[in-house]
Design a protein with these regions (language model features):
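A cross-family detector of function-defining hotspots
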Residues: 3-4, 8-55, 80-143
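Acidic/proline-rich low-complexity IDRs
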Residues: 4, 8, 63, 72-73
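Charged interaction scaffolds used for protein-protein
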Residues: 58-60
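Short, solvent-exposed aromatic-acidic interface loops
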Residues: 62-69, 136-142
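A low-complexity, Ser/Thr/Gly/Pro-enriched, surface-exposed linker/loop concept
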Residues: 68-71, 75-83
Length: 143
């Protein structure tokens, strides 16, 4: 799942930005000036893709949102159930159940799959048994 995208983890954002189809997608770049490490974010609002980079612009996390990310770039449909994901990716290294945050509202269950050099976090919808978001992270930034 998402193997080509995981290859961008740890590489400069410019590598992804120069590659198809991403080089054709409009994006917004911002720097979080209020934080000491000053991370750089790239948001592709029309395509459900977000990148978070170190201050040297090396990608440490890639967020793929089910409502607008191009399904052709994933090996698993966002319509997959949690059991479908577990069948494909195996036993998760960590999991969490659905919960309600007093301010942010309902969150669905989630699973984290550790891989050599990176991790795959799959968040599920609170209102349906399907994927809400997939996050790819370098191993050194996994919470």
């Amino acid at each position: 799942m998402t193997e080509p995208l995981t290859n961008y983890l740890g590489k400069p954002a410019s590598a992804l930005l120069a590659s198809p189809p991403f080089k054709f997608w409009p994006f917004e770049r911002s720097v979080e000036e209020d934080l000491p490490e000053r991370p750089v974010d790239y948001v592709f609002p029309q395509h459900g893709l977000e990148l978070t980079c170190d201050n040297d612009e090396k990608i440490h996390s890639i967020f793929l949102k089910s409502d607008s990310f191009d399904q052709a770039l994933l090996d698993i449909p966002f319509s997959s159930s949690r059991s479908d994901v577990l069948s494909l990716l195996g036993v998760p290294s960590k999991s969490g159940g659905a919960h309600t945050h007093p301010i942010l509202g309902e969150y669905g269950a989630w699973d984290l799959f550790a891989r050599p050099g990176h991790a795959i976090h799959v968040g599920y919808r609170a209102d349906a048994d399907r994927i809400r978001m997939v996050t790819l992270m370098r191993a050194d930034v996994v919470p």
